[in-house]
């Protein structure tokens, strides 16, 4: 009798884990879909220097030339078209450009 109850509990917990994993997968898929909607708008923004006094080398995606370009970020404000590295800028905006053109 104890074995049957333990087996039943184990089976129910496994079913619960599978359902939880499916829910997490669904949440991840929705997050990626929402991100892919957000990325194009970020990449279409002009470079946003901001209004502080620092001069930090950053990259923005120039939607006209379809390239990532260097700009000096002031350290505050600005906008989302602001990447720490050329690689990050290219991966975010160029990949999305090709996805939208197909």
From Swiss-Prot:
GO function terms (MF aspect): serine-type endopeptidase inhibitor activity
Gene3D superfamilies: Pancreatic trypsin inhibitor Kunitz domain
First-listed, main subcellular location of the protein, grouped into a coarse class: secreted
Localization annotation: Secreted
Pfam families according to UniProt: Kunitz_BPTI (PF00014)
Post-translational modification: N-glycosylated.
Keyword Lipid biosynthesis attached: no
UniProt-annotated site: Reactive bond, residues: 53-54
Carbohydrate attachment residues: 34, 62
Keyword field: Disulfide bond, Glycoprotein, Lactation, Milk protein, Protease inhibitor, Secreted, Serine protease inhibitor, Signal
Signal sequence extent: 1-20
Disulfide bridge positions per record: 43-93, 52-76, 68-89
Transmembrane segments: none
GO CC field: extracellular space
InterPro entries: Kunitz_BPTI, Kunitz_BPTI_sf, Prtase_inh_Kunz-CS, TFPI/VKTCI-like
Domain BPTI/Kunitz inhibitor: 43-93
Summary of the tissues where the protein is detected: Expressed by the mammary gland.
Keyword Disulfide bond: yes
SUPFAM superfamilies (UniProt xref): BPTI-like (SSF57362)
GO biological process, one term: lactation
PANTHER family (alphabetical): COLOSTRUM TRYPSIN INHIBITOR, KUNITZ-TYPE PROTEASE INHIBITOR-RELATED
Protein name, per record: Early lactation protein
Protein's organism: Trichosurus vulpecula (Brush-tailed possum)
């Amino acid at each position: 009798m104890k074995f049957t109850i333990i087996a039943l509990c184990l089976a129910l917990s496994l079913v619960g884990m599978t359902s939880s994993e499916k829910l997490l997968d669904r949440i991840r898929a929705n997050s990626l879909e929402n991100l892919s909607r957000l990325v194009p708008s970020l990449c279409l923004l002009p470079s946003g220097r901001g209004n502080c006094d620092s001069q930090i080398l950053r990259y923005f995606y120039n939607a006209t030339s379809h390239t990532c370009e260097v700009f000096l970020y002031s350290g505050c404000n600005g906008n989302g078209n602001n990447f720490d590295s050329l690689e990050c800028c290219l991966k975010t905006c160029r990949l999305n450009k090709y996805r939208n053109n197909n």
